[in-house]
C-alpha cells in the first residue's frame, strides 16, 4: 500500500506537466495556423515576427515546467552575452532535455523565439510538432551518406536572405551519449582513431557536415558561435557518470542541478575550409572532454562536480513563464468547455497531424 502510494506520487510529478504541454499543442497550432493564413499576403517579415513571438509563448510555458516547476538549479560558467545575437549553438548531446537547455540560455538573452534546430529526419513525423518545427525554421537532416547538403544550404540561405533572427542549435555528435551504450562509444572512438583524431571519453566524435554547411551559409550573418558544454548533476552518482535524465525523469525532479559552460567564439576564429573546420570542431570537443573528465574524475574534491572558473546561480523569474502557461491553458480549457470547441480540438489533433505528415513528406 505504501509502495503504491509512493509510486503514484512519483508519477504525478510528470503527469501534470505532460498533460498541459501536450494538451495545449492543438491550441497553439490553431493560433499559428490562423496567423499563417492572415499573413499570407503580408511581407514575410511580419509573419516571422509574430511566429517567433508565438514560439516564445509556448517555449516559455515549457520552461515554466522544466525550470520553475522542477526547481532545478542552473549554474552558468563562461561568457553568455546579455543581448541576443545571431549564432550557431554547438553542444554535447546526452539527453532529450538538451534542446530545453538551449531554451534556458536563449530566454536569458531575450532570444527564445529565435531558437531553431537542426533535427534528425525521424522527428519530422511527430504529431503536430514535426510540421511546425520545420515551419518555424527547423531543418531536418539525414545522417552520413544520405545527408542532403544542397537542401540544407537552400533553407539556410532563404533565412539569411529574409533577415530571420537565428539561434541555430546543432548537436554535432548526431546521437546521444550514453555511458551504458559501450558499443556506440567504441565505434565512435574507433572512427576517431582511424582518422588520426584524439579519442574522446565523455563525448562522441563530432560529425562536421551540418556545422560546416551552417557556418558556410551564415558566416557573414552570424555574430558568433556558442560552444556549450552541459552536465546534468544526479542526486546520487557516486562520482561516476550515469545515464542522463530523460524528460520524464527530469520532470520527476531527479536532476537538482544543470551545469552549463558557454564559450563564445568569434566567427573570425573559425576556419572556413571543411577539413580545417573538422580539426577545429574536434579540438573543441577535446576541450569539452577534458572539462568533463575533470568534472567527474578529478582527484581534487574542489575541482570535481564543477566546471573551471566562476559559476553564476541563474534563477529564472516565474514572471517570464507563468503568464504563458496560464494563457495557453486557459484558451485550451475554454475550447474544451463547448461541444464545438471539443470537436475543433479533436479535429486539430487528427487532421493537423495528417496534413502535417503530408506537408513534411513533400517539403521537409
From Swiss-Prot:
This is 1-acyl-sn-glycerol-3-phosphate acyltransferase epsilon. The chain crosses the membrane at residues 15-35, 61-81, 344-364. InterPro entries: Acyltransf_C, Plipid/glycerol_acylTrfase. Pathway: Phospholipid metabolism; CDP-diacylglycerol biosynthesis; CDP-diacylglycerol from sn-glycerol 3-phosphate: step 2/3. GO terms for molecular function: 1-acylglycerol-3-phosphate O-acyltransferase activity; acyltransferase activity. It catalyses: a 1-acyl-sn-glycero-3-phosphate + an acyl-CoA = a 1,2-diacyl-sn-glycero-3-phosphate + CoA; 1-(9Z-octadecenoyl)-sn-glycero-3-phosphate + tetradecanoyl-CoA = 1-(9Z)-octadecenoyl-2-tetradecanoyl-sn-glycero-3-phosphate + CoA; pentadecanoyl-CoA + 1-(9Z-octadecenoyl)-sn-glycero-3-phosphate = 1-(9Z)-octadecenoyl-2-pentadecanoyl-sn-glycero-3-phosphate + CoA; 1-(9Z-octadecenoyl)-sn-glycero-3-phosphate + octadecanoyl-CoA = 1-(9Z-octadecenoyl)-2-octadecanoyl-sn-glycero-3-phosphate + CoA. It is found in: Endoplasmic reticulum membrane; Nucleus envelope; Mitochondrion. SUPFAM superfamilies: Glycerol-3-phosphate (1)-acyltransferase. It comes from Homo sapiens. Keywords: Acyltransferase, Endoplasmic reticulum, Lipid biosynthesis, Lipid metabolism, Membrane, Mitochondrion, Nucleus, Phospholipid biosynthesis, Phospholipid metabolism, Transferase, Transmembrane, Transmembrane helix. Belongs to the 1-acyl-sn-glycerol-3-phosphate acyltransferase family. Its EC number is 2.3.1.51.
Amino acid at each position: 500500500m505504501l509502495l503504491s502510494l509512493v509510486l503514484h506520487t512519483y508519477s504525478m510529478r510528470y503527469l501534470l506537466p505532460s498533460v498541459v504541454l501536450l494538451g495545449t499543442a492543438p491550441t497553439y497550432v490553431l493560433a499559428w495556423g490562423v496567423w499563417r493564413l492572415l499573413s499570407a499576403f503580408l511581407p514575410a517579415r511580419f509573419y516571422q515576427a509574430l511566429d517567433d513571438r508565438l514560439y516564445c509563448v509556448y517555449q516559455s510555458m515549457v520552461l515554466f515546467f522544466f525550470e520553475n516547476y522542477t526547481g532545478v538549479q542552473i549554474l552558468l560558467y563562461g561568457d553568455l552575452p546579455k543581448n541576443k545575437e545571431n549564432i550557431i549553438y554547438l553542444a554535447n548531446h546526452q539527453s532529450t532535455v538538451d534542446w530545453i537547455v538551449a531554451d534556458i540560455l536563449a530566454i536569458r538573452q531575450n532570444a527564445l523565439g529565435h531558437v531553431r534546430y537542426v533535427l534528425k529526419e525521424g522527428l519530422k513525423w511527430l504529431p503536430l510538432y514535426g510540421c511546425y518545427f520545420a515551419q518555424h525554421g527547423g531543418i531536418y537532416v539525414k545522417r552520413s551518406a544520405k545527408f542532403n547538403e544542397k537542401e540544407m544550404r537552400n533553407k539556410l540561405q532563404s533565412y539569411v536572405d529574409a533577415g530571420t533572427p537565428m539561434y541555430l542549435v546543432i548537436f554535432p555528435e548526431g546521437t546521444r551519449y550514453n555511458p551504458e551504450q559501450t558499443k556506440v562509444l567504441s565505434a565512435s572512438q574507433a572512427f576517431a582513431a582511424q582518422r588520426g583524431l584524439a579519442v574522446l571519453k565523455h563525448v562522441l566524435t563530432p560529425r562536421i557536415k551540418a556545422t560546416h554547411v551552417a557556418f558556410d551559409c551564415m558566416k557573414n550573418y552570424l555574430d558568433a558561435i556558442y560552444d556549450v558544454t552541459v552536465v546534468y548533476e544526479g542526486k546520487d552518482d557516486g562520482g561516476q557518470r550515469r545515464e542522463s535524465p530523460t524528460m520524464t525523469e527530469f520532470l520527476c525532479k531527479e536532476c537538482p542541478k544543470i551545469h552549463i559552460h558557454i564559450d563564445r567564439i568569434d566567427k573570425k576564429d573559425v576556419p572556413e575550409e571543411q577539413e580545417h573546420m573538422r580539426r577545429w570542431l574536434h579540438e573543441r570537443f577535446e576541450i569539452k572532454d577534458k572539462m568533463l573528465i575533470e568534472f567527474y574524475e578529478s582527484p581534487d574534491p574542489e575541482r570535481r562536480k564543477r566546471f573551471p572558473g566562476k559559476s553564476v546561480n541563474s534563477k529564472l523569474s516565474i514572471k517570464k513563464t507563468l503568464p504563458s502557461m496560464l494563457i495557453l491553458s486557459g484558451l485550451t480549457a475554454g475550447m474544451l468547455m463547448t461541444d464545438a470547441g471539443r470537436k475543433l480540438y479533436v479535429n486539430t489533433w487528427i487532421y493537423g497531424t495528417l496534413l502535417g505528415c503530408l506537408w513534411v513528406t513533400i517539403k521537409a
